[in-house]
Amino acid sequence: MKKPTGVRLNNLLFSIFWWFIQKISPKNGEKLLYWGLQSGAFPNRFREDPRLATDILGFHLRTPIGVGAGFDKRVGVVDDLIFMGAGFGEFGPYTLEAEQPVTETFFMRRDKAIVVQSLGYKNTGLLNMVPAFINRRYLPNIVGVNIAITAEFEGENVKQGRVMTYEEEFAIMTRKIAPYCDFVTVNFSHPETELYRIVSDASMMVPILKNVKRAVAEAAPIQSPKIFVKIPLNVTPLELPLICSHLMTAGVDGVVVGGPLSLSQAKIKLSRKHYAGMLSGAPCKPFVLDMISKVYQFTKGKLPIIACGGVWSGEDAFECLAAGASLIQIGTVLRFEGPKAVTRINHELVTILKSKGFRSVSEAVGLDFK
């Protein structure tokens, strides 16, 4: 496991450093956070506990708490967070080529939330990131790569002067990255594009996922990374059973429930008014829990679920497990608290498991339906 090197801050210096990060702009704060993680400056208080360990899809994880996509697009800090207590991580999301949409980020500290106004995925492009994945391929950490596309018009995108179908684009990205990761997440969750509507259309979704499976088999027959699908929180009650049926038909390995929530569709009162954009953080929790429980029921517990969104405490994590999630991803809380959030949530989850007499987190999965 990768160990950061450098001078480690004591608790007092960390508190001062983190106070400073909170006072500067989100962009510069993120740069300092990344520097602290990469340099090994942050104190590491994580203590392993056998109750947290879990086995899923052939992976042995020391904790179900992982780092979600959106936190690390540079392949720079997820491995450091795994060293500091996360069980796994996910890079991205990446589009095939670089995208630099105009993006505004608002930290809603009173609401424990972030609002992002963007019509795409700001990233340097998967093609440009492949060398970074090659460089870290010998690390033992369990990591995934989140791949996405931004719809330019119905059914196809224009790339490098030619028309490329969604199936082709997802397959190309999968072939590029499959040899260097443990799982691939096909992301349909961007609420500010119509692309997420694909998930309820079997004629579009199933061929895409079967193409991705074929690409994995061709590019990484030995590693054979697992395939997850990230579905949006904004689907309707009528669409969700269809989506679950499509996922089972396509034969994917699991589903990621969550991601950002569209403010234009969610009736959430925030301390500051924002009429457009994508919301992440604590206010997403009720939506995530509701969808986890429904997906768990519709798939009869046969499809592993990763909860993504709204987790701020060990109690939140336990509620996700009880609703049917096997793993949990955090992201927004890391931007507010830094790496100590990983240690805190793990510790709180252990305390809850002890108090309820559980010997492992797996005993809590789907507890609401037992």
Predicted features and spans:
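Active-site glycine- and acidic-residue-rich loops that bind
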Residues: 151-170, 197-199, 204, 228-249
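Alpha/beta catalytic cores of nucleotide-metabolism and tRNA/nucleoside-modifying enzymes
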Residues: 1-46, 113-114, 120, 131, ...
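Glycine/Thr-rich beta-alpha phosphate-binding loop at enzyme active sites
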Residues: 34-47, 191-200, 240-301
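A gly/proline- and charged-residue-enriched helix-loop-helix capping module
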Residues: 94-142
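Catalytic cores of alpha/beta
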Residues: 74-81, 235-249, 297-301, 311-328
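Conserved, mostly hydrophobic/aromatic
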Residues: 25, 67, 89, 129, ...
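Glycine-rich beta-to-alpha transition loops that act as phosphate-gripper elements at the mouths
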Residues: 69-72, 146-150, 231-237, 303-315
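Glycine-rich phosphate-binding active-site loops on the catalytic face of alpha/beta enzymes
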Residues: 87-99, 188-190, 254-263, 310-311, ...
